[in-house]
Amino acid sequence: MADFAKENQFTPDQQAEIDAGIKNNIDVSIYAKPEFLAIQMHEIRIGLVEQIPVFYYADSRYDWFQMEEIRKGLEMSLDVSKYADPEISFDRMRQIRKGLEAGID
């Protein structure tokens, strides 16, 4: 595994998320990228720890609110393909997710 601490390209908050992932024994290379904000890294790390398919949202085009909505949908085994689109606002994503939870397609 790469030594992300020595690359000195991350903020202290980003480095903390990388360190937390290493402690969680997950593949931090998925999110240890300078283009992700620390809070985005956090959402990806949570997904990795929970063993959900983070490839749906491990993309810097999503803000962390959008990532959270996609992650919550994945946790509930919802069809997130209906709203996993960086062009859809997080509040619209939430509406779609809540509809899917309620059985509304």
What is each PLM-predicted segment?
Residues 1-105:
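General marker for long, soluble alpha-helical cores
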